Amino acid sequence: MDFSLNESQLSYLDTVRKFVKNEITPRILDMEKEHVFPWEIINKAWKTGLINLSIPESVRGYEMDLFTSALVVEGLSYGDTGISTSAMCNDLANVVIGLHGTDEQKNLFLKPFVEKPILASFCLTEPNAGSDNSMMAAFISKREDGKYILNGAKCFITNASYASQFTVLCKTGKPTGNFMACVIVPVEHVTSYDIPDIGNATREISVPAGGKIIIGKPEDKLGQRLSNTASVTFEDVVVFPNHIIGDRRLGFKYIIDVLDYARPMVAAIGLGLAKRAFDLTREYT
């Protein structure tokens, strides 16, 4: 098996290494001390092509293969795993749309990420269920007009305080239902110019379609401090039928595909961190 890198992959590696050296490494300690969300770095990563790697070419995305994506994530993680986690979670939230969404949904939900540096959140984990999907309580119920209502709480959600779109796994019909749906909840777009630093504040979002989302106080974490993590509560959020990905009974299958994408990325984050730790340790030998 040939593990050599092609010219495109070598070019991406060179780009991400220069980005880490010039934009991340000189600033992370001060940013962590000041509890500042790295909007400026996220913006520059977007302009450099180091974020939103999985978005299809049909909507002017990179449609980067899994191995090359892992190389980019590993490279960013060498600089800071919080920043790489925030960047990677955009793909975590959006890859299901690329895999199972219609052309209309790809244009509706993915194209905005190509056009501006916004963030997405992938909402799976719950306070009373962890990541055990069978114990999940968030659910959608169908109204007489054909629209759906989403209610439920999620926790430990990356990018939550700054997200412009939420990908949500929930039960169908009732909290104890046997089927799961994967729904997309877009909200008003948030950029660095809208919320430069949310600090320890909560955030309440009025959903354009109806209902509201309450974002809890950001978690004060031991590590990955430049990655925002918070709880998300959906209260009577209106979901249009075309905001449900694929079959509303097959959400679990779709999310498994997302997790299959995520696992190599998490491994790449660990590898980038290990390489950085090794290099820093060598300085003291």
Q: Can you name each region flagged by the protein language model?
A:
Residues 4-5, 78, 202-204, 210-285:
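Glycine-rich beta->alpha junctions and the first turn(s) of the following alpha-helix
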Residues 128-131, 156-159, 172-174, 221-228:
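Short Gly/Pro-enriched turn/cap motifs at secondary-structure boundaries
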Residues 1-87, 104-108, 112-115:
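Amphipathic, small/basic residue-rich leader segments at the start of a protein or domain
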Residues 116-124:
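A short, Trp-centered hydrophobic/proline-enriched beta-strand micro-motif
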Residues 147, 151-213:
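A short core secondary-structure module
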Residues 138-141:
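A structural signal for short hydrophobic beta-strand segments in well-ordered beta-sheet cores
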Residues 82-104, 130, 144:
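N-terminal glycine-rich flavin-associated loop
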